[in-house]
Amino acid sequence: MIKTQNDIESKTVVIGIGYLFVLFSFQVNYINRMKIQMKKWKLLLGTALVSVALLGCAKTNQPSSPEEAKKAQTVTIGYTQFPTNIDPADEYNGWFTVRYGVGETLFKMDDQLEPQPWLAEKIEQPSQLEWKITLRNDVTFQNGEKMTGAKVEASLKRLIEKSKRAADDLGIESIHSDGQTVTIKTKIEQPIMKNLLAEPYSVIVDVDGKAASDKAPVGTGPFLIKIYTPETGATLEAYENYWGGKAKVAQVQIKYFSDPTAISAALQSKEVDAVYGLPYANLASYKKDSQYKISEKEGGRYLSYVYNFENPYVADDQFRQALDTLVDKKTFTESLFKGAAVPATGPLPSSSDFALDKSVHEFNVEKAKKLLDEAGYKDTDGDGYREKDGKKVTIELLSFTRLPEMPLAVEASQQQLKEVGIEAKIRKVEVSAVAKEIDYAFTPYAVVAAPIGDPYAYFNSAVKTGGVGNIGHYSNAEADQKIEALATETDQKKRIQLSKDIQALMDKDHGYTIIGFYKVAIVMDKSISHLESHPTDYYHVTNKLSKE
């Protein structure tokens, strides 16, 4: 068949249309595929962007430098008191060994001030003069040495050799060890051995161990001393193999502030994370600020005036009574501590079974004037100040910043004395020098009389004639006899009565003016947890301390 030109053109048109249809279908399919691919790419791109954003957020919450990472793992605590060393056998420095989490004792006081096992598992009394202590088997010192009976024996022997206060309290005749047990034999019956082994001077140390600083011992606590600089502060690092579990933070910095007013500014500027010793005048503002947390406990720490019996005026009973009568305990506690303190009747708080029920103290300015007049202290030359035997009466008052409220109390007393015609001059001293001072009338002093739940150690040290803590040289033969009786008394009711009798004698003699009991408070940034106050006032840093 012969094809015509029209046939050829018709087929060409059909083929062309078919080709265009195929091409169009391909393009449509291609475009659809591209749309799907674009959707996939958009989804992938969106996911990637979200991931990057999340990574960016996560990164901003993490320390951006080694310095910031270190800071996140460091808790800095400011204190207004810092000893020259933390050897537990040196004076009262064991308080800081325990407070900083460096050292631990065989027993530990709970919140009810009852001794509980700590480094010890249990204690038994085979006879009246013997105590057998079984030790934990999983404790190591911060140099890796295991805590054995022999190590504990050496530590306790070192203690009674170096500390007269501890030796007098414990009355140890001999110490023997066997494996994980230690047997203590006493010279006389010792009814409160568990309590005394919870006293911070009883911190167990490795006598043969060498710490990074000669100012600190090798203890068993969660933190070990790396740097210790008197009058500045200390650096503590977590002990990797602490028996209670490694600490949650890597480092603790202790920073000393000689000026209590500066410690508040340091907390606000984040120079420190927490403070102990904040002026009570500043405490109220922190309670209202959600950026901070406060751990506050009713404690047994009191503020007092200790009268120096070496001073000839103070040695006069009526003059000393006049000094006591001029102290307005109610106003002092309300104005100085801003509601965080209560007036005291004696050295033990009313919550204690041992507390004195009633004091002979009374605030009475007119009575003070009358006492001075009767004792021959009179203003004979009209200058506004009293004389005795023709000589103007001038006394010296010590002042120091152990508490920011102390200087304020002394200044108030100076003014009160002036109003009754006694010239008083204030001399500022370091708290560490107070015990060695001899030329003064009275000094403020802050004490916890029964940090181990029983007041015997306090009476034996601070009240008994010649006691190592009796800085005012108070002496009463009857009180001494009762303290000696208290040392061996096993009946709790009789211990309570003896303690009240001793306080009544102190009170009657006006040997001390116990002004009031104040709460112990730690103020911290809200990021800090597990930094708690305790009624004893010496358990602060633990392995649970954390920082968010």
Task: Name what the model sees in each region.
Residues 326-355, 405-412, 435-548:
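Detector for C-terminal structural segments
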Residues 121-163:
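Aromatic- and charge-enriched surface segment that lines or borders ligand/interaction sites
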